[in-house]
């Protein structure tokens, strides 16, 4: 008799995706992040669901309801901080996953890569609207500043901003709709992730060498299920360490002050995972220019398959490209640091240089270096 997992319509899908999936035998731990992102998403949806049971999306009670969750709900503080720090873990995994894709040339799978870019945008939108919900000072002013950027759009900007706000300022209508968006978007992410996986399984996984591995495949289970469990344990350990020992390490103290439209915080800044983009935005003195730079700093990822000029897929055997890749990582870390600093000398200058380097590396240096490496191969 044939095994049920190979005949049952539902089990067959699970089997082909997670059990009998032919996988390259040489993929490293950098390939763990996909499954970790799935785990993060499920964890965020579950903790978010329990938080939504006690949260009230109203300007007068939102801040108090979060306090109530932390003080009065059984283990509410654990759920709240798991959710807040879970978002940080989510973005750490996203950036590692993207870095892996860039380094090993996973962008050759166009559809998978492009859906990944859409997933990134959706996740960033979810995190942004979620940060507004506790209705602290940074929530309120973050929402005001970021939504206000849309007013830089010529002709329709101001109307668009007021339409998003649902009034003439960030108020009750804004909070209610942001809660609605924050609830629905993770399920859209879930659907997109399924499509992401669907396209990936059309081609099969890439591997560190970037060379087709069809002649050397092993089943996903037990080899990679066991390997993924190690990543899962490390992720859970890190998340629990953060949540139970230093739950506010990555947060902003200003968000423990209830939102007050009459008093602006000294330094308005987003969560750490948006600081690199925020630094690029701030480094351009023109409002519209800054908004376009901010948008393009993420959209540039969609251009990466077109900017790939090397004859080799992976960077494994390309030392010059490897060097530039790590310069890019260092540059992004510099931008993240600058984004959290006040707008004053020397931070402004460092931010401008780092922003120029970011675009210069991706658009010019890396493609040109790849062409030079192609020439060197003929020597």
UniProtKB/Swiss-Prot annotation:
Look up and give the membrane topology term.
Answer: Multi-pass membrane protein
The disulfide bridges present are: none
* Superkingdom per UniProt: Eukaryota
Record-annotated residues binding a ubiquinone? 201
What are the TM regions of this chain, as residue ranges?
Answer: 33-53, 77-98, 113-133, 178-198, 226-246, 288-308, 320-340, 347-367
- Additional remark text: Heme 1 (or BL or b562) is low-potential and absorbs at about 562 nm, and heme 2 (or BH or b566) is high-potential and absorbs at about 566 nm.
Its protein name is Cytochrome b
Q: What species is this protein from?
A: Caperea marginata
Gene it is expressed from: MT-CYB
């Amino acid at each position: 008799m044939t095994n049920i997992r190979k005949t049952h319509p539902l089990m067959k899908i699970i089997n082909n995706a997670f059990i009998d999936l032919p996988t390259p035998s040489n993929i490293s731990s950098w390939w763990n992040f996909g499954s970790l992102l799935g785990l993060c998403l499920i964890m965020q949806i579950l903790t978010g669901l329990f938080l939504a049971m006690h949260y009230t999306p109203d300007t007068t009670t939102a801040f108090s309801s979060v306090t109530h969750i932390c003080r009065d709900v059984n283990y509410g503080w654990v759920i709240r901080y798991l959710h807040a720090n879970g978002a940080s873990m989510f973005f750490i995994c996203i950036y590692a996953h993207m870095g892996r894709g860039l380094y090993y040339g996973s962008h050759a799978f166009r559809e998978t890569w492009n859906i990944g870019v859409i997933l990134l945008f959706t996740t960033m939108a979810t995190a942004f609207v979620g940060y507004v919900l506790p209705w602290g000072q940074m929530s309120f002013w973050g929402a005001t500043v970021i939504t206000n950027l849309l007013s830089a759009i010529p002709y329709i900007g101001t109307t668009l901003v007021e339409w998003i706000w649902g009034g003439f300022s960030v108020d009750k209508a804004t909070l209610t709709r942001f809660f609605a968006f924050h609830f629905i978007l993770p399920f859209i992410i879930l659907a997109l992730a399924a499509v992401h996986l669907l396209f990936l399984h059309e081609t099969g996984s890439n591997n560190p060498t970037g060379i087709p591995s069809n002649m050397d495949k092993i089943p996903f289970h037990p080899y990679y299920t066991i390997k993924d469990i190690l990543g899962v344990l490390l992720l859970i350990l890190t998340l629990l360490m953060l949540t139970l020992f230093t739950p506010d390490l990555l947060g902003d103290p200003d968000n423990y002050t209830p939102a007050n439209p009459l008093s602006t915080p000294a330094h308005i800044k987003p969560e750490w995972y948006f600081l690199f983009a925020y630094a690029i935005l701030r480094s351009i003195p023109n409002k519209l220019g800054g908004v376009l730079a901010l948008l393009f700093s993420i959209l540039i990822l969609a251009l990466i398959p077109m900017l790939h000029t090397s004859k080799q897929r992976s960077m494994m055997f390309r030392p010059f490209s490897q060097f530039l890749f790590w310069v890019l990582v260092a540059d992004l870390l510099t931008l993240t640091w600058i984004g959290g600093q006040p707008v004053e000398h020397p931070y402004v200058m460092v931010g401008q240089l780092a922003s120029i380097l970011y675009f210069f590396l991706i658009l010019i240096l890396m493609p040109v270096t790849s062409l030079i490496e192609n020439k060197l191969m003929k020597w």
